[in-house]
Amino acid sequence: MNVSQQIGPRAAASERSMADAIRFLSMDAVEKANSGHPGMPMGMADAVTVLFNRFIRIDPSHPDWPDRDRFVLSAGHGSMLLYSLHHLIGFADMPMAELSSFRQLGSKTAGHPEYGHALGIETTTGPLGQGISTAVGMAIAEQMMAARFGSALCNHFTYVVAGDGCLQEGISHEAIDLAGHLKLRKLVVLWDDNRISIDGSTDLSTSMNQLARFRAAGWDAQAVDGHDPDAVAKAIERARRTRKPSLIACRTRIGKGAASMEGSHKTHGAALGEKEIAATREKLGWPHPPFFVPPEIKAAWEKVATRGRTAREAWEIRLDASRSKKRYEQTVERKLDGEVGDLLARFRGAHRTRATKVATRQASQMALEVINGATALTIGGSADLTGSNLTLTSQTQPISPGNFKGRYLHYGIREHGMAAAMNGIALHGGFIPYGGTFLVFSDYARGAMRLSALMGLPVIYVLTHDSIGLGEDGPTHQPVEHLAMLRATPNLNVFRPADIIETAECWEIAIGEKNTPSVFALSRQALPMLRRTDGNENLSALGAYVLREARGDRDITLLATGSEVEIAVAAAERLQAEERIAAAVVSMPCWEKFEAQDAAYHRQVLGDAPRIAIEAAGRLGWDRWMGPDSAFVGMTGFGASAPAGDLYRHFGITADHVVAEALELLRRACPETPPIGARTGKPVAHIVRSSEEA
């Protein structure tokens, strides 16, 4: 017997009233808030009622049950559809009072669904296309968990409701293509095919045959009347049987049921108004006051929770009987073995002894070789730059269609899709995803990276070729503004390590984060090992530290990150040797970690001498660390095509230029007398900077 038959032959009649409950709760909430989107919940109420009433397995009393079906509202503007469902099936944190507080400060019912803000919200949606793309990652994770633990412990579907806007966004193409290639058979997308956009009919801007598009990408695709419950049920049954991901085009009318506005784009993003809602109540035979659901309809909806609870209890019996129970639970919880930190400490000690000189992208791969050998939680990948990002290790065999036992995803040239899929993998649980591309192409992934931070997901972005140091590929590939953009993002750790020691330290931090994503900005060019002091303390965890202390009281402090720390050290040594100026060097591998330290530590590291910041990127953001008497050595515009060494000299990011800036800073600090070294009394030479250097 299939799932839908279990509901009985009279299901369709009761489902009409169940769907109307969604419609009126959505209308009432938007009306009270005078803000929101009633049209989509009203239009998709019939199809979603069938999905929940006949198929989906979730248990509101255990919203994090690992083998639950996932429901993703990609068209997040229709959030009242989700909140209404959660109230009706009995989520504890979604009483009627929350629905009547829709879009108000402090309520659980935010304008768009927010992960972690209310129970049962699988992912934050709102930026169109993100939900369907994140769902691809969830479906990948489900297949990977099933490959490791079997269908007895992992056997669930990922259902998505997507709108026209989701399918128009470019990220959807990346996600659809990847899902079809991987044959993600547990992914089912219900498309709200209402042919309405904010501006009016969708034929204003598109003539796309979406069914043909999905079929070309390897999906099963069907078209049904979205207001015919039995037709929707048959389509879902077929989708659950196919060996491909599935699209069900639900032909709907936006604002379905509205007395005079049904089918109008005016129902998309505004309250219907008291008169229209009153007329709709009369039209649909719903005589109840706002925010009221008759007990018999609420009871019908609560059967969804009963079915989910029964499924969960059966699953728990299987888990208890499984010999893999402990390993399964540790995997779901992403519990890292404490050995990882010890192994990385030994790794740092070994390379400190050897004074290993490598590009930080290579240092990252070497650290990953240690990490991936110590834990099976990590899932790597790259957007077609594996050989450049160096994200593949000996333990991470590729995942391919039909084979999900591997630990490495070839995402193709789909940076945005990769980032969203990693969000989905992290949200699903069981894995720590990392993926690589060039730093400059973080622009392409920006929307999903922002959601990583907003949701607090342990996703790791390995972004290599982080400056003009990549050389001949030129300004299209040389990031300038990207570090500033990433550092401006709340709850995102941006690591730019200076050598192999810092790289390993930063990986130790990133792999242990629970609620913060990480970015690694890594060099193409080889960098010397600068940290030669013994000790296992992870100094990068402090965000910044004094790498080279001044000899005596500081005359000047040089601040730098990544590949420019080498330049700062060379400049400090020259200032000491040639000018007897006491210069300290501060390495700042992670601003966010440094900002989290107390004021006393800030003063200890930064000191009170004039400061020079050195970074082969734009200045934006550096002033918070530089202080009033300061200078910046870095980029003021785009790069150029040339060998890396030539570019550093051309743009003045050299030890010579840093020395000149230091002397000029000290001269300006004492305009009436030549500046002198703090301890020696030796006059500092007068420097006149060329216009190019200035």
From Swiss-Prot:
Family annotation (SUPFAM superfamilies)? Thiamin diphosphate-binding fold (THDP-binding), TK C-terminal domain-like
Is the keyword Glycoprotein in the record? no
- Alphabetized UniProt keyword annotations: Calcium, Calvin cycle, Magnesium, Metal-binding, Plasmid, Thiamine pyrophosphate, Transferase
Q: Does the keyword Glycoprotein apply?
A: no
What's a GO cellular component annotated to this UniProt protein? cytosol
Q: Which residues bind thiamine diphosphate?
A: H77, G126, P127, L128, G165, N194, H268, F441
Could you say which residues bind substrate here? H37, H268, R361, S388, H465, D473, R524
The EC number of this protein is 2.2.1.1
List the residues marked with site Important for catalytic activity: H37, H268
Q: Which GO terms describe its biological process?
A: pentose-phosphate shunt; reductive pentose-phosphate cycle
Catalyses: D-sedoheptulose 7-phosphate + D-glyceraldehyde 3-phosphate = aldehydo-D-ribose 5-phosphate + D-xylulose 5-phosphate
Query: Which Pfam families does the record associate with it?
Result: Transket_pyr (PF02779), Transketolase_C_1 (PF22613), Transketolase_N (PF00456)
* InterPro entries according to UniProt: THDP-binding (IPR029061), Transketo_C/PFOR_II (IPR009014), Transketolase-like_C_2 (IPR055152), Transketolase-like_Pyr-bd (IPR005475), Transketolase_bac-like (IPR005478), Transketolase_BS (IPR020826), Transketolase_CS (IPR049557), Transketolase_fam (IPR033247)
- A Gene Ontology molecular function term of the record: metal ion binding
Organism's domain of life?
Bacteria
| Quaternary structure annotation from Swiss-Prot or TrEMBL | Homodimer.
Q: State the protein's purpose.
A: Catalyzes the transfer of a two-carbon ketol group from a ketose donor to an aldose acceptor, via a covalent intermediate with the cofactor thiamine pyrophosphate.
What protein family does this chain belong to? Answer: Belongs to the transketolase family.
Q: What is this protein called?
A: Transketolase
Look up and give the organism this protein is from.
Rhizobium meliloti (strain 1021)
Lineage summary = Bacteria, Pseudomonadati, Pseudomonadota, Alphaproteobacteria, Hyphomicrobiales
- What is the gene called? cbbT
